[in-house]
């Protein structure tokens, strides 16, 4: 549609309905907003999950370390109880006081948390002490134990006072009491390992307050902590460990801050991206309107318009061109050479012209050619090709305008018919060349037969003929006759129509036969044929004559390519080698090579690089190779020339022939 509002007077602005104007809901524009919300949600969930994971891991570690501290302290208290029980048993067994004191001193030296050991008789009188001196804090416990008259199964603990606890053990039911005083702060100081002390403060407390504590620095009230009942052995007490502030708190805070900053940056980037997307969409809308205007102008033309890139692939066609060739734009755009509207009779000429466009300078050109419509009819057209230059000044392809000049080219069609007649004559000349080659091959054995026959007649004329020499002459005549017959049979097998026969085939023998057939042609064009067989070549299942036909065709093509174009050497080498589960035959010539324009359609029918070629040889060769489940490919040769590679599979062991 056209919009005449706004802009200079008389100017018309082309718009496309639905592309410009307000949009009620633009789902694509909401994608960045959804991404922003999703990103913020994911970052928040990640931070929460990391914090929860760290907290759970810290709680689990705190509980584990608390259990370890509890077991360590309980073990040490058990050691003190065990010493007290042994001293009581020794005293009841009648051990001397001197021996008991010596054992007590040994225990005190090894366990400094045990402040002293004392013995009381059945009346509660102190009879010995290590170190010497009374212990008034334990008198009440001793009287209580003696008054009960019972023999407890384990030492009895008294109350904790000033960080000390007294434990007592009866010597016997009628005997005295052995008493030990243990310092809880000293026990914490001595028996807590350094790695616990570096991470935690340890405290033993009851309802009255802290009884003993070890902490290398003040502990915050909100610090993580874990408490475990320490009753028994100490009645009403609790063992508690408290974590210091995490040393990597600053690192965690920095990491979280970095994540938050990156999240903010990502959000800002998405906001900017969202705004840029909106501006870009508005620009795209304007561009679509401009393209619609230009498309309307192009579709109004009666001249066919066609754009293609440097390789010949079609980029654009207008309606007039589609009507010209009878094909839809969808069938043409993106299509590579050869084009469906190319006339088969002019395929070689068209390919040559495409090569000139690719290899030549980007200057305008004009030529006439023939197109084939989709209904099979052919039309004569005149094409004007001009370089397609992009906004950066680079040559991107060619823009062509095509005009139908069928009615004006009746005379040209007659001339082309004459050209086709000349082409058929050229093919007959090729057959004549084959006859010449056959005559050359037969000339040598026939001349040898004549020579041996003359020698045999001379031997017969002698008075006493040498039968041995005569026999040798006849044998050589037979060999030369077989050689001549082999030449005739080889050519006959090569040209006659026959059914393929697959059998075990020695490729080295087939290669030798192919080289012998093409040797005269090579000598005529001063080309040196050479074979290179690498390693042991396994046999393949193939038809001997068909594979020989492929090799002869490829070798002959290489020789003729070296004869017609500029060559980079005089050698044509055929290399036979094994490549994994296949055998490769490489025919390497020193000709001018194959251009990119021809390479894409080299194996198509009617495609040839020779001036008199029919363009069917390589297509037939590929069909023969594919019939043997192989492949035929080509590529450039190092130093100049072309390499054609035939790949044939090697039958697996046990596979049917």
Swiss-Prot record:
Coiled coil: none
Keywords carried by this UniProt record: ATP-binding, Cell inner membrane, Cell membrane, Kinase, Membrane, Nucleotide-binding, Phosphoprotein, Transferase, Transmembrane, Transmembrane helix, Two-component regulatory system
Gene Ontology terms describing biological process: regulation of DNA-templated transcription
Subcellular location: Cell inner membrane
EC id: 2.7.13.3
SUPFAM superfamilies (UniProt xref): ATPase domain of HSP90 chaperone/DNA topoisomerase II/histidine kinase, Homodimeric domain of signal transducing histidine kinase, PYP-like sensor domain (PAS domain)
GO cellular component, one term: plasma membrane
Pfam families: HATPase_c (PF02518), HisKA (PF00512), PAS (PF00989)
GO molecular function: ATP binding; phosphorelay sensor kinase activity
SMART domains, sorted: HATPase_c, HisKA, PAC, PAS
Annotated Histidine kinase domain residues: 437-652
Domain PAC as annotated: residue spans: 365-417
Membrane topology (UniProt): Multi-pass membrane protein
Segments traversing the membrane: 27-51, 253-273
Paired cysteines (S-S): none
Cytoplasmic domain ranges by topology: 1-26, 274-657
Periplasmic-side positions: 52-252
Modified residues (Phosphohistidine): 440
Residues of the PAS domain: 289-361
Function: Member of the two-component regulatory system DctS/DctR involved in the transport of C4-dicarboxylates. DctS functions as a membrane-associated protein kinase that phosphorylates DctR in response to environmental signals.
NCBIfam families, alphabetized: sensory_box
The name this protein goes by in its record: C4-dicarboxylate transport sensor protein DctS
Organism: Rhodobacter capsulatus
Gene designation per UniProt: dctS
